[in-house]
A protein has these predicted regions:
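Membrane-proximal helix-turn-helix segments that form the acceptor-binding/catalytic region
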Residues: 152-194
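Short hydrophobic beta-strand element within catalytic cores of glycosyltransferases
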Residues: 312, 332-335, 342
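A charged, aromatic-enriched C-terminal amphipathic alpha-helix characteristic of glycosyltransferases
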Residues: 232, 359-367, 373-404
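Conserved catalytic-core segment of nucleotide-activated headgroup transferases in glycan assembly
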Residues: 237-279
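Nucleotide-activated donor-binding/catalytic signature segment of Leloir-type glycosyltransferases, i.e.
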Residues: 278-301, 309
């Protein structure tokens, strides 16, 4: 079996983490696998490019720069195609699986992608298409993260905010939504199978494109994290005041980090110690430790291991890997209500909370937080979580899925 994983970025973001992990696990299993990505920072080759085998940067820098510049006006990526891979795919001996992940974010023109798939299928009928939906982009006119907006159910009549990612200056979502959805119907006609790690994304997709069109395979922790877990000694009792972690790529973004909730935790003063991990922290105080954005996962996991809990308040994530990772190392997660957090936590017997319930919880010991969130002791919660978010299980589900296509 020959598998090509496609994602806009190689090693940045949750979708990249899933795609890259599937790629690495497939290679370990002796399968033929390649990872095709759009671009790295600034449109250049990813800084992680040389760290992984069988990876290919696919898009010229000028294409991504042009898409970034024009997207704000046109609400779609005007340029970018996969035509330079046509011969590679069609000349491959044996069945080929093209597994798409995130294709938006200034990488590819969707119409060009569908046309490419049609040509490949006509030339090489044993090609199969799989598309993992990591966000809501397949149902909206423009954005990937709806942040609570349900305008897509009414064909994106008027965007309530132009700032939902990817942001724009002019709202053209209503003009684009039907044409975009037709392209997804065209992919279904080509036999593309859609998967999502999260039930609520699958439900949204199925409500538009037909019952059962999108199936569920939950995300799992990656190979690197599993290696780190094997070496980490779980910290059951932390010394001093409760240590609470907040993790986000950009800590300023309220959609990912509820700014008021963090400030309310800061107002607890010396009752807690707040640790942030991410860029551009706007939080400064006597009880705040800003670690910055930690690119070394080993260091991040080691730091989280010493925390009483991770507080998660994102409204825009769909099946956040950081939750799977924290839970797998035995760090309780105190999450505010959202479909994503509820879905992840329920898998290990946990629950979510309202904002006003968070403040009393963060003042508890690690064991008491585990009891409050998961209804069990710390060790039982840790063992349950380790099994629930297994990356090996994710691979086995996908490989079984590929083989049954």
């Amino acid at each position: 079996m020959n598998i090509l994983q496609f994602n806009v970025r190689l090693a940045e973001g949750g979708a990249a983490g899933v795609a890259l992990d599937l790629h690495q696990r497939a290679l370990q299993k002796g399968l033929q696998s390649r990872f095709v990505y759009g671009y790295g920072k600034g449109g250049k080759k990813s800084v992680s490019h040389d760290n992984y085998p069988q990876v290919l940067k696919q898009t010229p820098r000028l294409t991504s720069i042009a898409n970034i510049a024009l997207f704000r006006l046109f609400n779609r990526d005007l340029f970018g195609n996969l035509n330079n891979l046509y011969r590679t795919v069609t000349h491959t001996r044996g069945p080929v699986v093209l597994h798409f992940h995130v294709l938006h974010s200034y990488w590819l023109n969707l119409e060009e992608v569908v046309a490419f798939c049609g040509k490949v299928k006509a030339h090489k009928p044993d090609t199969r298409f799989v598309w993992t939906l990591h966000d809501h982009w397949s149902v909206t006119g423009r954005c990937a993260f709806t942040d609570g907006c349900e305008g897509w159910k009414d064909n994106c009549q008027k965007c309530p905010t132009l700032s939902n990612y990817p942001p724009v200056k002019v709202d053209r979502a209503h003009q684009l939504v039907e044409g975009k959805r037709q392209l997804f119907r065209d992919m279904l006609s080509l036999g593309c199978t859609f998967i999502s790690p999260s039930q609520h994304v699958a439900d949204a997709f199925n409500s538009l494109y037909g019952a059962g069109r999108c199936q569920i395979i939950n995300n799992g922790i990656d190979v690197a994290t599993e290696e780190i877990l094997a070496e980490l000694t779980p910290v059951a009792i932390t010394t001093g005041k409760p240590k609470i972690a907040v993790v986000a790529h950009d800590l300023r973004y309220d959609g990912k980090t509820n700014q008021q909730l963090v400030r309310d935790m800061m107002a607890l003063g010396d009752k807690i110690e707040l640790h942030t991990f991410g860029k551009f922290s706007p939080f400064e105080g006597a009880n705040v430790v800003n670690h910055g954005f930690e690119t070394d996962k080993r260091k991040l996991m080691s730091a989280l291991n010493g925390m009483n809990a991770l507080v998660f308040s994102s409204r825009v994530d769909n099946y956040p890997l950081i939750l799977c990772e924290a839970l797998s190392i035995g760090v309780p997660v105190i999450a505010t209500h959202s479909d994503a957090a509820r879905e992840v936590l329920e898998k290990s017997g946990g629950k979510t909370f309202s904002e006003n319930e968070v403040l009393p919880l963060v003042q508890l010991s690690k064991a008491d937080i585990a009891q409050a969130v998961f209804g069990t002791d710390l060790e039982s919660f840790r063992n349950r979580s380790r099994k629930a978010y297994s990356g090996q299980q994710m691979l086995e589900e996908y490989v079984s899925f590929y083989q049954n296509l």
